Amino acid sequence: MTTAFYPGSFDPITNGHVDVLVQALNVAEKVIVAIGIHPGKAPLFSFEERAELIRLSLAEVLPGKTGDIDVVAFDNLVVDAARSHGATLLIRGLRDGTDLDYEMQMAGMNRTMAPDIQTIFLPAGTASRPITATLVRQIAAMGGDVSAFVPAAVLQALTSKRPD
């Protein structure tokens, strides 16, 4: 069984992340969605909230495939975390050339540290290309409509986080 590791902050999960996950399930039988925990960062959503939003979002889009996806936390090197979960593929989504330049550098470093783990780049769909979780948080915090950028469960969670 091929296992893929899809790391990110997912704060929150966006339609772009979901798009990449759907594609990832076409190249791997199992996908580990790995939420990075960084002590120096103050995320909008806790790990538990992000994990639940990922599960709810995927249940909307992939009702029959949720058993093929695990959600975990990690706070170490991506390749070490991937290896500890038995993953041989590292999934990275690409929106544009800027992402590609950065991700190619990371893929090279990861390949040197873990030659047994292959990085797979999956392009974001046209509709999800401009979406970033940072922009979603900023727009939502200012009362903007982010419904085109996030799954319904995330929209509801963002609305509940907004001060009245």
Curated annotation (Swiss-Prot):
**N-terminal signal peptide:** none
Q: Its GO CC terms?
A: cytoplasm
Q: Which Pfam families match?
A: CTP_transf_like
For ATP, which residues are the binding ones?
Answer: 9-10, 17, 93-95, 103, 128-134
Q: Which UniProt keywords apply?
A: ATP-binding, Coenzyme A biosynthesis, Cytoplasm, Magnesium, Nucleotide-binding, Nucleotidyltransferase, Transferase
InterPro entries named among the record's database cross-references: Cyt_trans-like (IPR004821), PPAT (IPR001980), Rossmann-like_a/b/a_fold (IPR014729)
A GO molecular function annotation here is: ATP binding
The superkingdom listed in its UniProt entry is: Bacteria
Reactions listed under catalytic activity? (R)-4'-phosphopantetheine + ATP + H(+) = 3'-dephospho-CoA + diphosphate
Q: List the disulfide bonds.
A: none
Instruction: Tell me the residue numbers annotated for binding substrate.
Output: 9, 41, 78, 92
Localization recorded for this chain is: Cytoplasm
Q: Which co-factors does it depend on? A: Mg(2+)
**Pathway listed:** Cofactor biosynthesis; coenzyme A biosynthesis; CoA from (R)-pantothenate: step 4/5
Is Transcription there in the keyword field? no
Annotated site residues (Transition state stabilizer) in this chain: 17
Instruction: Cite a single GO BP annotation.
Output: coenzyme A biosynthetic process
Q: Which SUPFAM superfamilies match?
A: Nucleotidylyl transferase
**HAMAP family registered for this protein in UniProt:** PPAT_bact
Q: What does this protein do?
A: Reversibly transfers an adenylyl group from ATP to 4'-phosphopantetheine, yielding dephospho-CoA (dPCoA) and pyrophosphate.
Q: What NCBIfam families does the annotation carry?
A: coaD_prev_kdtB (TIGR01510), cyt_tran_rel (TIGR00125)
Family stated for the protein in its record: Belongs to the bacterial CoaD family.
Subunit record text: Homohexamer.
The name this protein goes by in its record: Phosphopantetheine adenylyltransferase
Q: Output the lineage of the source organism.
A: Bacteria, Pseudomonadati, Pseudomonadota, Alphaproteobacteria, Hyphomicrobiales
